[in-house]
């Protein structure tokens, strides 16, 4: 079973909310909703690999390494 963690950030790069899901599609939908609410959200899998993001990535988080 896979686990996906979605974290929402404000424009200063501070993590504001985190949710964990076992379904990639649910994680994708939550990521979109969080980005609309907070400005940026990204989803990582159980191993910390990038699974998706929405919104404008804050400069404070640096460049995403894929």
Feature annotation, model-predicted:
Residues 1-15, 45:
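Short aromatic-glycine-(Arg/Gly/Cys) micro-motifs in beta-strand/loop hairpins
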Residues 21-42:
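A short, charged, amphipathic alpha-helix used as a generic interaction element across diverse proteins
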Residues 9-11, 24, 49:
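Generic structural motif
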Residues 35-66:
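Short, mixed-charge low-complexity intrinsically disordered segments
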